[in-house]
Amino acid sequence: MSEIKMPEFLTVESALKDSGLAVTPSELHGLLVGMISGGLSLDDQTWKPLIYDYTNDGMGWPDSAIKVGSAVFQCTVAELTAEKLALELLIPSEKESLMNRADGLSEWVNHFISGLGLVELKLDKTSDALKEALADLEEIARLGIDEDDDLEEQENLFEQIVEHVRICVLTIHAELGQQIHTDASKTVH
């Protein structure tokens, strides 16, 4: 079985821009991870109408954007449902400036929270750990980089924040997200 690989940030960005969609790769991935972590079905295409409504006034996407969006969705499902938990955020690479990466992280986190809302997350029925993780993400979404401060120190802090975002997301997904049911778990009579 081949491993599903996340498309590169620039590939996703190009496909979205070329399709005339006003959504960044970070926003798209954040939305998808939020919806999946909030309990969206993994077995059908219910994510597409939600994405169309949120990003394109309900209009479908061109085929090239759908292809890339589907690849991002499939890779995200694979990451979030794997035995070894690993989630790579689709944000600008380390080659980009710290400002661009911080903006990408902010977009990602804001859209993750929106993705939870799209699947109608009910906070009153969640654990304290989930509420704390969500509160941390809401705080992180408001963070910014101060150009006057030590950029090397901020770079180190940024990496710690990215790791904390991953932990918060995995905490939320562990409580609310669906898991893929494999054939091995089915009973044969």
UniProtKB/Swiss-Prot annotation:
CC terms in the record's Gene Ontology section: cytosol
InterPro entries in alphabetical order: YgfB-like, YgfB-like_sf
Family stated for the protein in its record: Belongs to the UPF0149 family.
HAMAP family: UPF0149
Descriptive protein name: UPF0149 protein VFMJ11_2207
Source organism (scientific name): Aliivibrio fischeri (strain MJ11) (Vibrio fischeri)
